[in-house]
């Protein structure tokens, strides 16, 4: 179910599996076991569903049976923007574990349905190539990789695998709640995949190949939490660089926002993200308004940190080293 090259890659890394006890991550758990790939697991309890207690218990049971380390986080209550805040909490939790335990790869169980949902959301917002090409199988971070081994498999493929082998898994009913925007696209993507996955996989391969050209137009020179500093080859690549970076941070750029970026070097996107160009350096960070002491302001000015970026640096005590 996963490629030989992917198996070799996973065997060359110290792996942490993002686990939820749902269909996708349960399938990946047992696929890794069947291929004798070493890994440990991490799970987040958001405390929103009674079933979550059973899922945590099952994760502990699996860790005990198969001699895996398990890391558990209890998320705080999020009063608004649950999906974005939950994602930020989850990936920060994974990152901390990775840094503290010297893991070199984070494994996530995203599959083809997820990838198609992302594409449909992008189309509905007038998105460009970076969003439409979707999730990548391998994303290289500062000191680890994110690897998604199941991107060419459908949800039905994974269900068939689990049911045939009689492996236990849970169904998260919140995935059907339409108050979450992404869930509205799920029935559409599921019905489209009934026509077969080969054509969709081929189209995604082509999109990814074409997007590689644009990825070579910039490089990340500094990264900390939700701050990125990119070095651009040319101003014309700014909209793509912003789009690609914000996609990694969980925000899909709209067509209107892309148009604005063609002509503006300093902007706040969606009232959340500050984007500022200084020479050939592009700064992207969460937009935070705070009172900054005069002496610290001067330090930022001397360090050439753009004004809209300073609030995030100050609130997170980040010293940008370029």
Question: Can you name each region flagged by the protein language model?
Answer:
Residues 1-120, 156-157, 164:
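ATP-dependent adenylation/nucleotidyltransferase module used to activate substrates
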Residues 6-13, 139-140, 205-322:
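AMP-forming adenylation/ATP pyrophosphatase catalytic core
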Residues 44, 75, 151, 173-175, ...:
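Proline- and acidic/polar-enriched loop/turn elements at helix boundaries
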Residues 65-69, 94-98, 130-134, 194-196, ...:
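Glycine-rich loops and low-complexity Gly/Arg-rich segments
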Residues 80-84, 181-183, 265-266:
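Short, solvent-exposed polar/charged micro-motifs at secondary-structure junctions
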Residues 113-250:
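Flexible helical/loop "lid" subdomain adjacent to adenine-nucleotide binding pockets
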């Amino acid at each position: 179910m996963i490629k030989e090259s992917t198996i070799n890659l996973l065997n060359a890394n110290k792996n942490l599996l993002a686990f939820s006890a749902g269909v996708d991550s349960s399938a990946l758990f047992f696929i890794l076991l069947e291929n004798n790939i070493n890994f440990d697991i991490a799970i987040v309890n958001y405390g929103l569903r009674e079933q979550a207690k059973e899922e945590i218990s099952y994760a502990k049971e699996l860790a005990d049976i198969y001699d895996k380390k398990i890391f558990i986080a209890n998320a705080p209550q999020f009063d608004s923007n649950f999906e974005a805040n939950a994602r930020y909490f989850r990936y920060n939790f994974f990152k901390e574990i990775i840094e503290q335990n010297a893991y070199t790869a984070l494994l996530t169980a995203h599959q083809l349905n997820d990838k198609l949902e992302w594409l449909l959301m992008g189309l509905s917002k007038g998105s460009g190539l970076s969003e439409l090409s979707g999730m990548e199988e391998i994303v290289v971070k500062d000191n680890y990789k994110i690897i998604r081994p199941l991107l060419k498999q459908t949800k039905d493929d994974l269900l068939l695998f689990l049911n045939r082998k009689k492996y236990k898994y849970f169904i998260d009913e919140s995935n059907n709640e339409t108050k979450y925007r992404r869930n509205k696209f799920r029935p559409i993507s599921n019905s489209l995949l009934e026509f077969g996955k080969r054509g969709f996989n081929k189209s995604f391969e082509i999109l990814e190949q074409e997007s590689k050209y644009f990825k070579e137009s910039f490089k990340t020179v500094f990264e900390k939490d939700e701050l990125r500093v990119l070095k651009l080859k040319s101003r014309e690549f700014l909209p793509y660089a912003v789009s690609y970076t914000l996609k990694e941070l969980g925000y899909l750029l709209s067509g209107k926002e892309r148009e604005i970026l063609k002509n503006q070097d300093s902007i706040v996107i969606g009232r959340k993200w500050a984007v500022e160009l200084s020479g050939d350096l592009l700064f992207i960070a969460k937009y935070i308004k705070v009172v900054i002491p005069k002496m610290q302001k001067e330090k930022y000015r001397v360090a050439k940190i753009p004004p809209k970026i300073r609030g995030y640096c100050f609130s997170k005590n980040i010293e940008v080293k370029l």
